[in-house]
């Protein structure tokens, strides 16, 4: 049998596969498969981070190599450049993996970028880095993970544009996304413990979880929501927004691991703080779905880019799987928001909420 890392292409061998079987092949990757570097963990994380960027084509879900290895590069950037975590067992010829060597060469050529977050590296430099990593890393890891998962996860052709994830595997990864992420982090950390010195291992799991940094400046989304939709009330409680306007991830960032327009709403500080890492109550789904239908029609480059892979069923499915992963529901805190605004108990609630929620939710 040809070694997995030598494979140039592979077909999905079965589309009728049980969850038990998929757990079996993932657990094999996490524990039993042979590894000289961490690329399999990196590829699994990049796929999980890209679940909501995949598009249904026929009976499978497509994701481009460009999108996969942009996440792959971003995830490795902090681990290698910021935290100095080695990612490969020494093979007698080199102690650095290709992704480490690419980063080291770029940092040696321009020391300044070592201090930068991945997203703020110059676009030309960042694209060149992603292209080089995609070229060097995919020829080894894509076939290797394909073989370890027995051809049940995806089909691929290294000469073409990306992977095709089977529908069964896609639904499985959505349903068990959080559990798969935790197992992947744990297995990745166990591997890193074997090849790194003690000092860099401090807070290792936190370093892995934070390898995909959350974007902190969401002001551009705030302005689009205010300008294009004239949103001047809290999405959840309907109270008038003041200067302290929060851009909230409708489905928490900790689950989605991405910043996209279709998942943003404006909220008051009280609701944003109360909601925290919860999903909104189910009654809010219709409201955001209606908003997103309007948003998809806006002539704005950022909005267009964010909605390219969006479909009408996305929010319902995301909400469902986030709930299955254990996320609690948040409901409106009308009374608390009114009290904070100095409004007497119950005066604002009915009128504001009726305008902020779908009419059919009221008797």
What do these predicted regions represent?
Residues 1-218, 283-294, 299:
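Mixed-charge, low-complexity interaction segments
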Residues 40, 226-232, 260-264:
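Short metal-coordination and nucleic-acid-contact micro-motifs, chiefly zinc-binding Cys/His arrays
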Residues 48, 52-55, 77, 226, ...:
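Hydrophobic/aromatic-lined pockets within catalytic cores
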Residues 211-222, 247-253:
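Short Cys/His-rich Zn2+-coordinating modules
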Residues 233, 363:
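Long C-terminal interaction/binding lobes of large macromolecular proteins
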Residues 31-38, 228, 255-259:
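Short, solvent-exposed segments of well-ordered alpha helices
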Residues 282-358:
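C-terminal structured domain segments
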Residues 235-266, 275-290:
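Histidine-centered nuclease catalytic patch
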């Amino acid at each position: 049998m040809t070694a997995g890392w030598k494979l140039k292409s592979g077909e999905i061998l079965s589309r009728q596969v049980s969850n038990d079987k998929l757990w079996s092949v993932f657990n094999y990757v996490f524990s039993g498969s042979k590894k000289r570097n961490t690329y399999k963990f990196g590829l699994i994380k990049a796929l999980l981070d890209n679940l909501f960027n995949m598009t249904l084509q026929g009976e499978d879900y497509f994701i481009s190599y460009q999108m996969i290895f942009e996440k792959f590069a971003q995830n490795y950037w902090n681990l290698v450049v910021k935290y100095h975590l080695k990612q490969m067992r020494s093979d007698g010829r080199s102690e650095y993996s290709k992704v480490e060597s690419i980063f080291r060469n770029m940092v040696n050529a321009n020391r300044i970028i070592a201090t930068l977050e991945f997203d703020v590296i110059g676009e030309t430099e960042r694209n060149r880095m992603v292209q080089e990593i995609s070229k060097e890393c995919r020829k080894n890891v894509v076939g290797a993970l394909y073989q370890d998962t027995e051809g049940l996860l995806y089909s691929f052709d290294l000469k073409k544009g990306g992977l095709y994830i089977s529908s069964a595997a896609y639904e499985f990864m959505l349903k068990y996304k959080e559990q798969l992420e935790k197992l992947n982090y744990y297995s990745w950390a166990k591997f890193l413990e074997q090849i790194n010195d003690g000092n860099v291992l401090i807070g290792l799991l936190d370093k892995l979880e934070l390898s995909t940094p959350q974007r902190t400046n969401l002001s551009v989304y705030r302005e689009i929501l205010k300008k294009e939709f004239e949103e001047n009330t809290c999405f959840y409680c309907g109270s008038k927004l003041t200067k302290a306007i929060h851009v909230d991830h409708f489905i928490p960032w900790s689950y989605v691991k991405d910043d996209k327009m279709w998942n943003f709403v404006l909220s008051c500080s009280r609701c944003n703080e109360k909601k925290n890492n919860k999903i909104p109550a189910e009654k809010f789904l219709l409201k955001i779905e209606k908003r997103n239908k309007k948003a998809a029609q806006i002539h704005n480059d950022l909005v267009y880019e964010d909605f390219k892979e969006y479909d009408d069923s996305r929010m319902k499915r995301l909400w469902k799987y986030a709930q299955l992963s254990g996320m609690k529901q948040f409901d409106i805190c009308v009374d608390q928001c009114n009290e904070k605004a100095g409004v007497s108990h119950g005066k604002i609630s009915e009128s504001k909420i009726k305008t902020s929620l779908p009419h059919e939710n009221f008797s």
